[in-house]
Amino acid sequence: MEIFEGDSGSRVSRLEVINTGRRRRFTEDEKLRIVAESFAGRGRASATARQYGISRSLLNRWRKSVRQGLHGQKQTDGFVPAFVMPETFVPVKQVTPPAAMEQPVASPSGRMEIVAANGRRVVVDGSVDVEALLRIMRGLETLR
């Protein structure tokens, strides 16, 4: 038996190391079952965490990932197969549209409605300055 000296000079004759146990590993199905149980009623998250011996923060992390639809999905990081195709010549035939379709259709009031990719709409008159309209549309595209 080894004897250790303490900070104050006292001798320590016994030293006990307490093991906290091994880390629990839950399968995806177990996690989903625990999360479903935690959603069963008001105040069930804390009780469920205590029942399974996990922290509330871990259970809340699982609950958040389930709400966001991230839980139980496979990771998609990594490489994807790539194919190198031989370069081939494909002739292109130019087709002219019928004469009836060549003229743009004008609305009776001369107004246009432009919808940006983010859903914002701009209604302009037919005499709008194109450069100014482009600046406005670029500005609207940056707004999210």
Curated annotation (Swiss-Prot):
The keyword Acetylation does not apply. Signal peptide: none annotated. Coiled coil: none annotated. It comes from the Bacteria. GO terms for biological process: DNA transposition. SUPFAM superfamilies: TrpR-like (SSF48295). GO terms for molecular function: sequence-specific DNA binding; transposase activity. Keywords: Plasmid. The keyword Glycoprotein does not apply. Pfam families: HTH_Tnp_1. PANTHER family: TRANSPOSASE INSC FOR INSERTION ELEMENT IS2A-RELATED. Belongs to the transposase 8 family. This is Uncharacterized protein y4hN. It comes from Sinorhizobium fredii (strain NBRC 101917 / NGR234).
